[in-house]
Design a protein with these regions (language model features):
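Periplasmic-side early beta-strands and strand-to-turn transitions of outer-membrane beta-barrels
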Residues: 184-185, 193, 205-326
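Face-selective signature of the C-terminal outer-membrane beta-barrel domain
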Residues: 259-274, 318-480, 485-486, 502
Length: 553
């Protein structure tokens, strides 16, 4: 893919307003509340802000989420300057690997954004629910299929590679979701809302602690459902019902923390998300729904092989026959973390995680040449006869991650030393529903970094870092049972250096340079659709993406 040089230049950024004279800037042993606090450089302080090394960072706190009643992560992110959220519009869910049906986030036009929960990456190195191949999108996760909103304490938006900890491939930036933990005093909430089109939302949260406060717990559950949505057609000027846009989504989150003493703590978290969503793909074009136009569309498609609205005007109306089409995803993610130290705001811990994600759905009745003109009396009878239920499956895909993460932080004089190492084993399973055969792809990775945040003065710090990335080759098993390997194992070290300087309590400047590295992913090779018993010389020419990023603000 060759080297690319990315430069983002900004006018000197001044902190908005004066700094709070009562703000606490020391991070040692700090218990960060929902109150807004800033460090000496004007950066928002969060539970994990110390790992950042400067840059354009904005934080969405729980008060903002609750007051504005955001129902999805994308709803909150789209109000951040420079952040764009692409959604299918009108319906939820999404077909696995089909970019246009997913919610994708980009920062300053770059979709290579890493999404984390409590500092841990949530993507899978061999499977991509958002895009089966790189030409579809460089995004690697659906932003609205990560964690329930009731479980979110804060959302950090880091534009550009603002911290070495988050990986050498985060060229666009990082979104770090920080989850809630139990309160010292028992507190619970019940939430209910209703709206047009049979929309309902039921939510419940409860948190508290034991008598000593050492054991804390948090629990959240929510169900959201809706019937078919309605919309105004700008072309015809009429209002219509958008059929097959209903959904039923469930979230369940639980977290338990036990504090042995000031240095040792054990935390367990569980995150469940499930979407059971109708699938319309796109809205009809009512200009082409007469008997004559419908028959022309079918003839051009089935007999003359004309695809797309340019060659076959009204082509998208063919999807109306996908009666009963749906997409379902089911996610169950676990984390167990043991904290064994905290020094100058830096946690030392060891974490085990396990992710299980399942995606399946159907295209309903599919493309049907025998279908009568939609929304006519003849159509109603035909639709009732040919509607498919949830028992039909057109695709079935599973993603699994299992890994171990170790972090250690130590302050030595003016040096704050921090290192993190993560071993991850990612697996992808694709099942041929009709033949009941399964292909799989597997890849191991080790990602690590060493960072030294040097406090030169009270107003100036510089942070050099080295990042290590190891990716194994792809181990594959085809649907025919053929075992093979593709690609090659790679080990890369990428440096970075970031500095920030505070002129006074109202103005600061930051600058940084980093080498970026994005490994070839399974979608680049398109391995999941390749006959592994034969070679692919075209794929062999692909190279990992490398380059430089310079930031100034």
């Amino acid at each position: 893919m060759g080297k690319k040089f990315y430069a983002m230049m900004a006018v000197l950024a001044f902190a908005a307003g004066g700094m709070d004279v009562n703000a606490v800037y020391t991070l040692d042993g700090i218990e960060v509340s929902a109150d807004r606090q800033k460090d000496r450089f004007g950066n928002m302080i969060t539970e994990q802000s110390y790992y950042r090394t400067g840059g354009d960072v904005q934080v969405i706190d729980s008060d903002t989420i609750e007051k504005r009643h955001y129902t999805q992560v994308g709803d909150a992110l789209k109000y951040i300057p420079g952040v764009q959220v692409q959604t299918p519009g009108g319906y939820r869910g999404g077909e696995y690997g089909y970019t246009q049906t997913h919610s994708i986030v980009s920062i300053n036009g770059d979709a290579r954004v890493i999404i984390l929960v409590d500092g841990r990456r949530m993507d899978n190195s061999v499977g991509n629910p958002v895009a089966d191949y790189a030409a579809g999108s460089k995004s690697i996760i659906d932003v609205n299929q990560i964690v329930g909103m009731d479980n979110i304490e804060k959302i950090e938006v880091i534009k550009g590679p603002g911290a070495s900890i988050y990986g050498a491939d985060a060229t666009g930036g990082v979104i770090n979701i920080i989850t809630k933990k139990g309160a010292l005093k028992p507190v619970g909430t019940i939430d209910f809302s209703a709206g047009s089109w049979k929309r309902f939302s039921y939510g419940l949260t409860y948190s508290g602690s034991n008598d000593t406060g050492k054991l804390r717990y948090f629990f959240a559950a929510r169900r959201e459902l809706s019937g078919d949505s309605h919309y105004h057609d700008g072309i015809t000027g009429k209002n219509y019902t958008w059929h097959q846009t209903g959904y039923r989504d469930n979230t369940l989150n639980a977290r338990v923390d036990y504090k042995f003493n000031d240095r040792h703590e054990l935390a367990f978290s569980y995150n469940h998300m499930q979407g059971n969503d109708d699938y319309p793909l796109t809205a009809p074009d009512y200009r082409y729904l007469s008997d004559a136009e419908w028959n022309r569309i079918k003839k051009d498609y089935f007999q003359n092989d004309k695809y797309g609205n340019f060659d076959n005007p009204g082509y998208r109306n063919l999807w109306i026959t996908w009666l009963g089409a749906y997409n379902i995803y089911n996610k169950n993610n676990y984390d167990l973390t043991y904290y064994f130290g905290k020094d100058h705001g830096m946690d030392s811990f060891i974490r085990f995680y396990d992710q299980h994600e399942t995606y399946f759905g159907s295209f309903g009745a599919g493309d049907r040449e025998d279908a009568p003109t939609p929304f006519t009396p003849a159509w109603d009878a035909w639709a009732k006869k040919n509607h498919k239920g949830r028992d039909k499956k057109s695709y079935f895909t599973q993603l699994k991650n299992r890994g171990l993460q170790i972090q250690y932080g130590k302050a030595v004089g003016k040096h704050d030393l921090l290192t993190t190492w993560t071993y991850d084993k990612s697996r992808y399973y694709d099942t041929h529903v009709r033949k009941k055969t399964t292909s799989s792809v597997e890849r191991e990775s080790v990602l690590g970094y060493v960072q030294d945040k040097i406090h030169i003065t009270d107003r100036w710090e510089i942070t050099p870092a080295l990042r290590y990335s190891y990716y194994s080759d792809f181990a594959k098993v085809s649907k025919a049972g053929v075992h093979a390997n593709a690609g090659k194992s790679v080990s890369v070290v990428t440096p970075s250096v970031v500095t920030q300087f505070a002129f006074d309590d109202t103005a600061s400047i930051y600058a940084g340079w980093t080498k970026v590295y994005r490994p070839i992913r399974v979608g680049d090779y398109h391995l999941t659709n390749t006959d592994y018993s034969s070679g692919n010389k075209v794929d062999a020419k692909l190279e990992d993406e490398k380059g430089d990023v310079v930031t100034l603000g």
